[in-house]
Amino acid sequence: MPHAPARSGDAMSAAAPPCCTSLLGLSLSMFVAPCALAATPLEGAVVSAPAPTPPTPDLAYPELFQAVQRGELFDDQKHFVDFLPLRDPALINADYLAQHEHAGFDLRKFVDANFEESPPVQTDAIRQDTALREHIDALWPKLVRSQTNVPAHSSLLALPHPYVVPGGRFREVYYWDSYFTMLGLVKSGETTLSRQMLDNFAYLIDTYGHIPNGNRTYYLSRSQPPFFSYMVELQAGVEGEAVYQRYLPQLQKEYAYWMQGGDDLQPGQAARHVVRLADGSVLNRYWDERDTPRPEAWLHDTRTAAEAHDRPAADVYRDLRAGAESGWDYTSRWLADGKTLSTIRTTAIVPIDLNSLLYHLERTLAQACAHTGTACSQDYAALAQQRKQAIDAHLWNAAGYYADYDWQTRTLSNQVTAAALYPLFAGLASADHAKRTATSVRARLLRPGGLATTALKTGQQWDEPNGWAPLQWVAVDGLRRYGEDGLARTIGERFLTQVQALFAREHKLVEKYGLDADAAGGGGGEYALQDGFGWTNGVTLMLLNLYPSPGAIQAPAKTKRKPEPAAP
């Protein structure tokens, strides 16, 4: 993907090769993957060079693409970008240009004649009298996909091993979703599948230089919250410590991706994902290589940019894309006025969750290097310590919680969000900061159905009143690490009760939950509520293991709804 021009304050120099990277006075040239260790092929992985990646749908057939998205032929803007062109997209687009002004031209019929539709993931052909845990175990095969080869012109990226998709409209693997899914796979005894998913992500790093948002061409310009080191840690718990050495090359490449472009930054400048603060501290932000509307949400993005009268549309598009990379798409955390999407400024924010995850990556790299007996262990440990110091200096609010920092205005957020618990999850918080954060979270975010994402009602899906499975697990695991078992149990049991109540009523697990007493699915966002659902399944199994209350594991009431056959 081409790099877009820099905005003011961004030092967008050409990216240096990973071997030439330097940071905080420490030369990484000795221990970034291409220099230190040859990336040996993983067992069973596809090692031949992949076919050239086709252009994204908005570039492959631009006029047709815009006509379909602008005309709202489908309720969900993602639907069309997942369609398979039945012949050369350039020829399809040329035919569209030649025909679309003719009398009687029918755009929908033209699309139907030239594309194959991708159906949603079906998960409703499971017996209606299964208990929750049994239902989840039965769901895994429904969510598994194997795509070692893809048809020409598809937006899907091939992967060497089977993988689990979230469900519904999400027909591909997603980066940060997959960690929480893998937790459940391991708990279900599906350790081979969990290992295969980890190997898929290692393959993506080796092939594309990073783990994209998902295995689609239109996701390649960005990543998602970097959970690869947590996946390696999870697999080490299954196979043993040798796992760290096996994935060291990919861990190093992952780190190089997130730190790329940070060379020679002056205080107050940013490049790609890297920000150098006014005091010289180096932290990270979310970012995307492209500054155009997201193909999977094209109409939403163009309308949002049109409402931002005082900003270049390209800036709005990049901030929307960066918000998608954050996983929190969207939330008041990224909005200048705290409520209006057109004020989004994601790239101006140094997020507490992202930097906690990168601290864990640095610590994992130090551990992996220690297994090789190389000096890079001390170097990565030093980088982790410097990041911790920068987090304590800039992302700790004296009111008693971790928060996001706006590097452009040099202001710390006064908003308590579920992201405040990531430093506990990563193990970087001091005992005092952990205790004070727990107190703040209990006072501001505890709800009848679990942990609220934020305390603001904006209509965005990563705000009040929604609760999300991954954030419940980050909270529960992080709080337990620091002895806050009571609050952890309260959050975990309340969320389990919410999951069980909706399951008993509708026999499904969903992407997000409302946290009110009525135990409904969550709302807001750019698309309808999805069921399946990968990360909810995984977190539910983890919570059931910790808090196995009878009400959370009994079978739901029988329903008269007749199950439909599964899609092929």
Swiss-Prot record:
Known EC number: 3.2.1.28
UniProt enzyme class: hydrolase
SUPFAM superfamilies: Six-hairpin glycosidases
Protein name as annotated: Periplasmic trehalase
Function summary: Provides the cells with the ability to utilize trehalose at high osmolarity by splitting it into glucose molecules that can subsequently be taken up by the phosphotransferase-mediated uptake system.
Gene Ontology CC: periplasmic space
Listed PANTHER family: TREHALASE
Residues of the signal peptide: 1-38
Organism from which the protein derives: Xanthomonas campestris pv. campestris (strain B100)
Similarity comment text for this entry: Belongs to the glycosyl hydrolase 37 family.
Keyword Hydrolase: yes
GO molecular function (one): alpha,alpha-trehalase activity
HAMAP family reported for this sequence: Peripl_trehalase (MF_01060)
UniProtKB keywords: Glycosidase, Hydrolase, Periplasm, Signal
Cell compartments where the protein resides: Periplasm
Catalytic activity from the UniProt record: alpha,alpha-trehalose + H2O = alpha-D-glucose + beta-D-glucose
Residues involved in substrate binding: 169, 176-177, 213, 222-224, 294-296, 327, 526
BP term (GO), one: cellular hyperosmotic response
Residues of the active site: 329 (proton donor/acceptor), 511 (proton donor/acceptor)
